[in-house]
Amino acid sequence: MKFSDIISKLEVTNYSLTQNPNNDPEITGMAAIDEATSGTLSYIEGAKFASFIAKTNASALILPQNEAMQAQAQERGIVWMATPEPRLLFAKAIALFYQPYTPTPEIHPTAVIHPTAKIGNDVYIGPHVVIQPGVEIGNGVIIHPNVVIYPGVKIGDRTILHANCTIEERSQIGADCVIHSGAVIGGEGFGFVPTRTGWYKMEQSGYVVLEDRVDIGCNTTIDRPSVGETRVGYDTKIDNLVQIAHGCQIGAGCAIAAQTGMAGGVKLGNRVILAGQVGIANQAKMGDGSTASAQTGILHDVKPGEVVSGTPAIPHKMYLKIAALYSRLPDMYQAFRQSQRQLEEEGKR
């Protein structure tokens, strides 16, 4: 595919092009900037990666709107397209060369489907899938091998369930969701009441709701509560190995990275970003547009738009100032001890 054909298929409106329109290389694939070979298209997102332009073997680049970077590519004879969102354009270009595996609609003979289940049109149900009573499956749903769907579950149109995931009782999965292998949606919340003789198990009668366009990574667990619902909002993306406890309410457009854990009743607003290994304590709230950096421990509420780091969480700028002092602490302590000794000696005179 010619570079010019890629640009036209991306339907970009706000962009600029290389000053050599006669150079229109054949693009055979996509590659990271440091792994690109002749015939591949790559991208650079920001100025801190500009040094790669001098070393890359890519035939074409998607660049930010940075004249210095564009001139550098021009000098090397690399054709380019500049846009305010190079990573987004690169992601769209990948889709021109790669299409994920989509099985032909069918129901495999080894699938076990209860007669009360309702199955939509153009559905694929793979080997050894188990679909229990009262389940409703929308149109165009793909259910890969060994998936287990408990009673009363509802799954919206075009949702994809990858192999070996489990959707437990009464869960409601929206349209265009993707649930990856090993995930468990709607498992029992951690509900036990202490008594004088041990723990009394509180039945978890609630359910989980995933709104439309939610992505759930491998081995992530989202628990149902004792009453009510656990909810994940529209277009939220959740990475692998995330634990979301009973009764959590997650807003729309959030991004949650791997190994994050939320205790019961946590509430996230819209567009909240959690980096890896964030821990959030019971009932804590994070406002719209707030962010927690990696390994943050959130014990109290976070204001809308606030960026926090550390344990317990503090404003990110304050955390950076404190972190800058860590390496100086031994010298500061020695200086303090020396001053202390001098004062003690002066006190003896």
From Swiss-Prot:
Residues the record marks as active site: 246
GO cellular component: carboxysome; membrane
One Pfam family this sequence matches: LpxD
Top-level taxon: Bacteria
Molecular function per GO: N-acyltransferase activity; structural constituent of carboxysome shell
EC number: 2.3.1.191
CDD domains named among the record's database cross-references: LbH_LpxD
GO biological process, one term: lipid A biosynthetic process
Reaction catalysis annotation: a UDP-3-O-[(3R)-3-hydroxyacyl]-alpha-D-glucosamine + a (3R)-hydroxyacyl-[ACP] = a UDP-2-N,3-O-bis[(3R)-3-hydroxyacyl]-alpha-D-glucosamine + holo-[ACP] + H(+)
Pathways per UniProt: Bacterial outer membrane biogenesis; LPS lipid A biosynthesis
Keyword Lipid biosynthesis: yes
InterPro entries, alphabetized: Hexapep, LpxD, Trimer_LpxA-like_sf, UDP_GlcNAc_AcTrfase_non-rep
Record keywords: Acyltransferase, Lipid A biosynthesis, Lipid biosynthesis, Lipid metabolism, Repeat, Transferase
Family named by the database record: Belongs to the transferase hexapeptide repeat family. LpxD subfamily.
Oligomer and partners: Homotrimer.
Function: Catalyzes the N-acylation of UDP-3-O-acylglucosamine using 3-hydroxyacyl-ACP as the acyl donor. Is involved in the biosynthesis of lipid A, a phosphorylated glycolipid that anchors the lipopolysaccharide to the outer membrane of the cell.
The protein, known as: UDP-3-O-acylglucosamine N-acyltransferase
